[in-house]
Structures are given as structure tokens and as C-alpha cells.
Amino acid sequence: LLIKRVLDWGVGASNLVTYFFGVLAIGLLAYAAFHDVAARTVPNWLSLCLLALGAAVRLADHTLEAGLIIAGVTFVLLFAIWVLGLMGGGDVKLWAAATLLVPPDLHTEINFFFGVVLLGGLLGLVYLALRPVLRRVRAAGPAGRMAASRGLFARVLRAEAWRIDRRGPLPYACAISASAILTLLPLSFQL
């Protein structure tokens, strides 16, 4: 009934598919970011789901071939960066899958790419800024370290503090997901 009403309002099936898959993709991208912060991994099933969603959306708007070419080139270039040890494998797969979600026009793809780069740089600056703060918190003793805090969020914060203190890798899926979400939001909600 809802689909019939939406179609009666003049919204085409392609827009409805884009809207539905856009909402689903945004949820999966947010989950990828949170999972990367919590565990420093991006599950393969998540990248595969995003890849399938991207393929479905590109099929609906008749740009599957162009989307697959751009996602494939992205994967190959990022794979080379992974081989050099400069990026995690989960981030490579997530970025390639997210590239397929983004419409394959030059303007949108460039916005997505520079969004990832800029947000990744901002993430790096935040991590650099947090190092001195964490040193002061650690110097305050157990109370300063939130030793009494419980719950998932507190554990993630403690783990993140430990990673920052030891100069661990950045959760780059946050930058990839945020850029993809910022790119998809205006496109997904054009009902």
C-alpha cells in the first residue's frame, strides 16, 4: 500500500529503490565506522552487502557498468596502497564498495574522494590533539582513566585511549563512511 501511494504521488520506482537502499547503506556505513573504532576491523560481510546495494542502485539507474569500472579502479589503486602497508585491507574493501554506492559521475566521485581524504586528515589531527590530553588523564591515576566506568561505550573509549597512546592505526572507516554518508544523504532523500 505504501509503495502504491508513493508511486501514485509521482515518485518513480528508481527513486524509491534509491531511497530504500540509501537508508540501508547509510545504516551499514555507520555500523562499519563504529565497528572499526571498536575493533579496528571492517567485516567482509559488510563490504559485500554494501557492494550488493551499490550494484542494485547502479542497476536501477542504468549506470552499473560505469560504477563497476570506477569501483574496480579504486580497488586496484587502494590494493597497491595496502601492499605498501599504508592502509588496512578492510578499509580498501569498504572504500571500493562505497565507491559503487556513489553515482558514477565525475563531480560526485571527486567530492566523495576528497571527502574521504579531508575527513581522514581531520581524524588524524584529532588523534594527534588527543595524545597530550591522554597523558594528563593517565597521570591522574585510576580515577582519571575511568577505571570505574562500565558499559560498552566506556570500554571502547578506554581501548581507543590505549590505541592513541600507543600510536595505533586510525579507524579510517570513519572517514570513508562519513564521506559516503555525506555524499549519499542529499541523493537518497530526493523524494
Q: Across the structure, where does each feature detected by a protein language model lie?
A:
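A membrane-topology feature that recognizes alpha-helical transmembrane segments
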Residues: 1-191
